[in-house]
Amino acid sequence: MKLFRGPTASFVAAAATLAVVSGVNFNSDVSVKTTSAATKTSSTKQTAVQSAKQTSSDSAVSLAPVEPVAACSDLLAVDLTAIGGSGSNITAAEETDSDGITYCSVTGNFASTAGWQVMMPVANWTQRYMQVGCGGLCGNINIQPGAADGSAEVSNGEFALASTDMAGGSDGEFGLDEDRRVAFAYLAVHQTAETAKKLIKAYYGQEAAYSYFNGCSDGGREAVMEAIRYPNDFDGIIAGAPAMLFTFQNSFHHGWLSVSNTDDEGKRVVIADRASLLHDAVVKACDSLDGVEDGLLSDPRLCNFDPSTIECAADATDNSTCLTSAEVTAMTKFYNGPKDSGKYLTVGEEQYGSELAWSGVFVSDSYTGDIMSTNTALAAIKYLIFEEYPGDNYTLSDFDFAKSTIELLRERHPLLDAVSSDLSKFHKAGGKLILWHGWADPHISPRTTIAYHEALQKNMGKSALNEFERLYLLPGVYHCGNGEGPSAIDLVTPMLEWVESGTAPDAVETSTPASTGDSKFGQWAKSGSGAGGPPSGAALQRNLETEASASTSGSAATTVTRPVYPYPAVAKYKGAGDVNDAANFEKGGALYTKTTRSWLGEDFFKPYTPTKA
């Protein structure tokens, strides 16, 4: 019953219903997409798609809705032992409503204790599956598709959805357990994909026509990890602000930001309102470098602002409009990153124009406030990225920002990192990859994503890469959303068009978000280290992406729209008209043409064989 669509769907459903009444064997193995299964060639898909029932959807292909052939509660009988190991179980299978959409929500756990949730629409399933990534060190399940602002398929509840907590937790202690560490590194995501596909087959009587992955932050790492390790799991992968260089990201990067903003007394050197002072100076100095004064830096690499230019005079008694010497030193470290013998230890640190985003990450509102970067770094350093456990009393003052430490990261690099520049198997399978990153992201440097894009080009060739990969950079946008720049974006629709009809994406319009809620897409869990799926009867965890409106370009009443183009192209102002209107921009050439700077860990981006544990 593969790929039945259009007019045939109702007949298939009827036949499958009879099979259920007669007693379907839910414990039989389902053929998840493997290398051999990948021979579902594009021509086969196109033939099937041609018979699809057309609807009012704006996506490239409109697939006929398929109704369930089994009761939701029947899915409790599905055996997942072959997928998740002995002890894997389904804890609940029941219908529940969210935003007027009724889902069959199925939850459970794998042997590693990783929890998962699959949600299948009772009506209007248009034969697509989307798995959503999990942010931070995970430990919770929140199925919230991001980069989907304007996607009819997402907002109408047409996707079967799933996610996993990856057996993780924000304190990182799960890393001491090998099974949970492996589940977090890669395995739980793959097992969830296999589980969802098996449940979809059992519930609807047919497989999903297309499968997609959509994640940001660690979810972005998970996305690229799937392309590397399991190239046939998904037809299309959207990876936002990917924490793909995990071992560096959560040690050298966050660790450096923490120690650089901590004085000898353990207090903060720079606080939020002082970062705001710096931001104003940066924008004043560099805003016009991209050809338009709009409060945004289209490519921060053009900016070379020196914080010392607004340093207070030695005899100043009022520093309300200038920076202290200590602040200048700390801010310069934020931008430059750590070095050993004059050589950089990271790809790139904070970008000019990101200053307002520092608050809550490595800058606090007060001189005695905690900063997230400290906890982030310690969780990874103590429990995940090194083979040897450094002990309970380990602090960031014990971390050596040196080349020798990079050598210690190599052991778990092929387990945790997702930066192999060989995606040839994913390419051969017909997969499509969209990378995206906010230029003002304080958590993960967009330069890491650029460096990965460049590594792919170098290893695979520009022509081959152009067949299946695109990178979008969003000016003024923070981590997975929000910011001074327009951050609402729909990359789902272009991905569907690319995968299902072969139309490669080009210009994508962004806008200021209209909603006012907090986004959980790609974000860290607030607390907790426990694993396991939602308990029986747990509330449905489907939420559309929403973003805070505290920081957007223009006034609160102003809607800003702006196109973004595949890197290295940028949106170029036409020279006339409202700078807040996308219609007044066109595709422009690269503003910055240098490749990523040389740094001591650049060989991590070379092709490598991922390890299992």
What does each model-found stretch correspond to?
Residues M1-D29, T34-A37:
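Fungal secretory targeting signals
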Residues G23-N27, K33-T35, K40-R128, V132, ...:
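Catalytic-loop region of hydrolases
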Residues G135-G205, S251-F252, V259, N393-E407, ...:
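Cap/lid segment of the alpha/beta-hydrolase catalytic domain
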Residues Q206-S217:
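Alpha/beta-hydrolase fold nucleophile elbow
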Residues G215-M225:
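Glycine-rich nucleophile elbow surrounding the catalytic serine of serine-hydrolase chemistry
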Residues M225-A227, N232-K339, L473, S487, ...:
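A catalytic-pocket lid/entrance helix-loop region that shapes and gates access to the active site
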Residues L435-H437:
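Short beta-strand/loop motif that positions the catalytic acidic residue
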Residues F468-N482, A514-D518:
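Histidine-bearing beta->alpha loop at or near hydrolase active sites
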